[in-house]
Amino acid sequence: MSQQLLEELGRRQYRTDIPEFRVGDTVRVGVKVVEGNRERVQDFEGVVIRRRGEGINENFTVRRIASHGIGVERTFLLHAPRIDYIKVIRQGKVRRAKLYYLRGRTGKAARIRERR
């Protein structure tokens, strides 16, 4: 009984406005941030280095290089209500499902070819 209830709740949370994107793509994720009584949308742009899970539990990790060359990674639930939008900026061409090797690279070594 509880499994059916969980599946029903999951179906209500499903989002249909999510674009198709893969590992290696550069995306811009709009995250809703609450500050006091105000709510605003904060952009986080970077390369998708991982997608995992399926259904309502699917998530993805985005990596970007912040100021002073420090890498920042954020993991988002794909169907989370906190995500306002996801925009695909650039489509990358990679041969791996997980791009963890980018953690050890900076600058030109961390570039990804563009998919046509």
Curated annotation (Swiss-Prot):
One GO term of the biological process aspect: translation
Alphabetized Gene3D superfamilies for the sequence: 2.30.30.790
A molecular function GO annotation: structural constituent of ribosome
The name this protein goes by in its record: Large ribosomal subunit protein bL19
Entry keyword annotation includes Ribosomal protein: yes
NCBIfam families: rplS_bact
The keyword Ribonucleoprotein belongs to this UniProt entry's keyword annotation: yes
Protein task: This protein is located at the 30S-50S ribosomal subunit interface and may play a role in the structure and function of the aminoacyl-tRNA binding site.
Keyword annotations of the record: Ribonucleoprotein, Ribosomal protein
GO CC term (a single one): cytosolic large ribosomal subunit
Family per similarity comment: Belongs to the bacterial ribosomal protein bL19 family.
SUPFAM superfamilies cross-referenced by the UniProt entry: Translation proteins SH3-like domain (SSF50104)
